[in-house]
């Protein structure tokens, strides 16, 4: 199954999942860290609306084992932060893959810290998928939007090339992918030229719309002349209807401090549906507050819920 097929399967709400009491999701993203070394203008993380720390290793092990026992099959070792900042990332991959038996363990990175030896360790631990978020046309734009030194742009490209070399030399089964934000006009043309540089080194490249991050960064995007898609409607070539939002039904999101969130962009904690340090994953997944939110989504009216502020529902 390709990465886009997996994404489309998760962003499509199967009839059996379209209920207030929903089956345990097939996929969960768990946040090893809330930290990131970038300060991207299109991401609300840099607004620092919550504490940004690393997950306790013991809590990680507890939750990952519990979720696998509950029936979760696909585990993303990231959420809102950059997981390559965590020293024990390869150990986390090994624990999920080898000790807990997840069929599919995946990771998304900005690429700057995905150094060859770190990537090698993750692949040897059993990583199934490594995706690079590649959103900039050149070093100048990269520095302006990501808020970091321009030299990292070339470093990211070098890391992508190295990842392909390591995978091929050691015959790992890890898929290598890249996503980019889909722009139109001149920026769109520039992005395609930039993507051509990395295209030989990845298995698949796909586009994502520019998100408003639960309407937290829409002002910044408007100021820069960017046109954002509200909510999380999946990838650009297979946009989903904004209501009901798939994230409420098909994929779990666990923060570094053990909160279960209903949103892909929970930068301020308003979408917390349960505390996994106090209750089980299956229990929190169908908590009363989560059930109530799902009913609103199924009814097509999220006014009065935590989701009403998202521009998708205005």
PLM region descriptions:
Residues 37-45, 262-265, 304-313:
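Local cysteine-cluster metal-coordination motifs and their immediate loop/turn environment
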Residues 13-23, 171, 288, 299-300:
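Short loop/turn hinge sites at secondary-structure boundaries
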Residues 2-129, 145-154, 158:
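Conserved alpha-helical substructure of the radical SAM core
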Residues 1-5, 55-58, 102, 120-284, ...:
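Radical SAM enzyme [4Fe-4S]-AdoMet core and its adjacent flexible, acidic
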Residues 30, 34-37, 239, 301-304:
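Processing junctions and N-termini across compartments
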């Amino acid at each position: 199954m390709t990465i886009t097929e997996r994404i489309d399967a998760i962003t499509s709400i199967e009839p059996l999942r379209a209920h207030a009491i929903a089956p345990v999701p097939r996929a969960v993203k768990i946040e090893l860290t809330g930290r990131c070394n970038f300060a991207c203008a299109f991401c609300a993380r840099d607004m620092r609306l919550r504490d940004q720390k690393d997950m306790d290793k013991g809590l990680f092990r507890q939750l990952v084992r519990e979720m696998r026992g509950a029936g979760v099959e696909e585990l993303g070792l990231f959420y809102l932060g950059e997981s390559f900042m965590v020293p024990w990332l390869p150990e986390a991959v090994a624990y999920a893959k080898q000790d807990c038996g997840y069929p599919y363990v995946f990771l998304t990175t900005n690429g700057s810290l995905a150094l060859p030896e770190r990537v090698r360790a993750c692949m040897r631990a059993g990583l199934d998928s490594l995706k690079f978020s590649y959103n900039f046309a050149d070093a100048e734009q990269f520095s302006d939007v990501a808020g970091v030194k321009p030299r990292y742009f070339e470093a990211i490209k070098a890391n992508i090339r190295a990842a392909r070399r390591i995978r091929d030399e050691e015959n790992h089964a890890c898929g290598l992918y890249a996503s980019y934000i889909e722009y139109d006009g001149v920026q769109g043309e520039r992005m395609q030229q930039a993507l051509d540089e990395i295209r030989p080194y990845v298995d698949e490249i796909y586009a994502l719309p520019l998100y408003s991050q639960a309407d937290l960064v829409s002002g910044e995007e408007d100021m820069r002349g960017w046109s954002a898609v509200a909510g999380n409607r999946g990838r650009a070539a297979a946009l989903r209807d904004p209501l009901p939002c798939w994230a409420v039904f098909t994929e779990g999101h666990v923060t570094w401090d053990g909160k279960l969130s209903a949103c892909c962009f929970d930068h301020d904690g308003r979408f917390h549906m349960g505390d996994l340090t106090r209750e089980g994953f299956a229990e929190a997944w169908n908590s009363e507050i989560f059930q109530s939110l799902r009913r609103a989504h199924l009814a097509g009216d999220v006014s009065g819920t935590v989701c009403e502020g998202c521009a998708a529902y205005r």
